[in-house]
Amino acid sequence: LMDEPLAALDAERKWEVLPFIDRIQRDFGTPIVYVSHSIEEILQIADTMVLIAGGGVSAAGPVEEVLNRPDLLRAAGDGNAGSVIPVQATGLDPAYGIATLSFAGGEFRVTAPDLTVGERLRIRVRARDVSLATERPQHVSVLNVFEGTVAGVSSAHGPQVDVSVDVGGTMIWSQIT
């Protein structure tokens, strides 16, 4: 049982220690119950998660499934709602430190100079960082633009709505006003 084991560490040290915790589980097959409020830590090391809210289990299952459930979109907090997408590093541009991450709906380009081609990982795209357009944007500095189909719209709270967009079979959430 690891109950918030990295809570006292600064962000840089957390990212140094997390691979070692992940390696213990993978190399030795030792099950770890890892308690955390950090979505980033969970994405780095967990395969299965149990979401506890209000003193009870709200959801359990594979990390991607739990964190992509529409009814739990806000479980991470309003500013952290988003999509978890499994990707594979398929290209690296060392001159610029840009990695190409492929998924069912296309390719993300992100700054990630330490990735290795072939490496599989999960990324989280915050819903508040996803813009929607009726036409393909031009003359913008945005690296990641995808075509998709609006699959659903649901009320958030306040002036926002959550929009699910199907991008090649992958659901990506957007939170718009």
Task: Describe the residue ranges of each PLM region.
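Helical segment within the ABC ATPase nucleotide-binding domain
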Residues: 15-28
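OB-fold (S1/OB) nucleic-acid-binding surfaces
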Residues: 101-107, 165-172
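Catalytic Walker B motif of ABC-type/P-loop ATPase nucleotide-binding domains
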Residues: 1-4
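Short aromatic-glycine-enriched beta-strand elements
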Residues: 96-99, 159-164
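Glycine/charge-rich catalytic "coupling/switch" loops of P-loop NTPases
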Residues: 107-154, 171-175
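Internal alpha/beta loop-helix hairpins
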Residues: 26, 36-106
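ABC-family nucleotide-binding domains
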Residues: 10
